[in-house]
A protein has these predicted regions:
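Terminal accessory/targeting
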Residues: 1-3, 9, 13-118, 122, ...
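Divalent-metal (often Zn2+) His-rich catalytic cores of metallo-beta-lactamase-fold enzymes
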Residues: 128
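Active-site histidine-anchored catalytic micro-motif
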Residues: 125
Length: 282
């Protein structure tokens, strides 16, 4: 199985509409939903023939728990305080124990939100924060405590071989994406044992090295190598896109500090790539 996934559903009405359009033409089969975002048209969403997943969010917008219960995670107005780096530093600081307890509170709130939808537990996270070892371990604990039978969890530890073998793509690799890939691979090594112990299904992942540049030519060059690895491991593949771009003048309910990502022309590129794939999954 190849999952073609769009993240960040719920950023804005317009962004959601663009993701829905990709799904409606058969270019997507998985959409990850922000628990603290918006779902502009629930009836339309229910008509889409896709798998929906919970896009756990610990970095942007308002938390689902009371601000007074999670002061390390959220400010007095309930807005998340930290980036990925901030959460990681907090997880290895002297405040680790307090942070873990508050993290558990917020993760329970987000899992409970998803329980009410009645949808299968297909789990990933905004900016891949669940790969921080303390977050990963706490998430698995919450799932166990709440007796949640998770169907799938994203494990964004990309194989490096497909990218090493594509010499023609070397000039296009962004240094920031190389760093992200290395960090997530390292964190993947730390989380590997817990993942195996949990028994939750995952898939071979693509979407870090080409983040912001998931165009047709790049994806097609590395996908044959991905298929070989997946066949050898008897694994599914998950390919991540961010087609929910926004235009200037459109409003998001989230923080301005992240808005440059949503207005980025790179997201429009990924939207266009999926439109080229019309009907590919039908």
């Amino acid at each position: 199985m190849v999952y073609i996934c769009a993240d960040d559903y719920g950023i804005s009405k317009e962004s959601c509409a663009r993701i829905e359009k990709c799904a409606a033409v058969g270019a997507l089969n998985k959409i990850s939903v922000l628990p603290n975002g918006i779902i502009p048209n629930k009836e339309k969403v229910s008509d889409l023939k896709v798998k929906f997943g919970l896009h756990i969010n610990l970095v942007e917008g308002r938390a689902l728990s009371a601000a007074s219960d999670i002061p390390l995670l959220a400010d007095e107005n309930g807005y998340f305080r930290h980036s990925f780096a901030g959460l990681f530093l907090l997880s290895v600081s002297h405040k680790r124990k307090k942070f873990e307890k508050q993290l558990e509170t917020e993760l329970r709130s987000q899992i409970e939100f998803w329980r009410k939808t009645g949808l299968p537990y297909v789990i990933d996270s905004h900016q891949h924060t669940h790969m921080i070892p303390l977050v990963f371990g706490t998430l698995l604990k919450v799932l166990s405590d709440m007796k949640v039978d998770a169907e799938y969890i994203r494990f964004p530890s990309e194989p490096t071989l497909p990218y090493i073998k594509c010499l023609s793509l070397y000039p296009t690799y962004r240094p920031v994406n190389i760093i992200k890939q290395l960090i997530l691979k390292f964190l993947g090594l730390l989380n590997k044992t817990e993942l195996k112990r949990s028994g939750i299904k995952t898939a071979l992942f693509m979407g870090i090295m080409f983040s912001g540049r998931m165009d047709k030519s790049r994806v097609e060059k590395v996908i044959p190598q991905y298929i070989k690895i997946a066949e050898k491991k008897n694994s599914d593949i998950e390919i991540l896109f961010h087609p929910g771009y926004m235009l200037h003048g459109e409003k998001t309910g989230f923080s301005e500090k992240f808005s440059r990502f949503y207005f980025s022309k790179d997201r429009k590129t990924e939207y266009d790539t999926l439109q080229i794939r019309k009907g590919a999954l039908k």
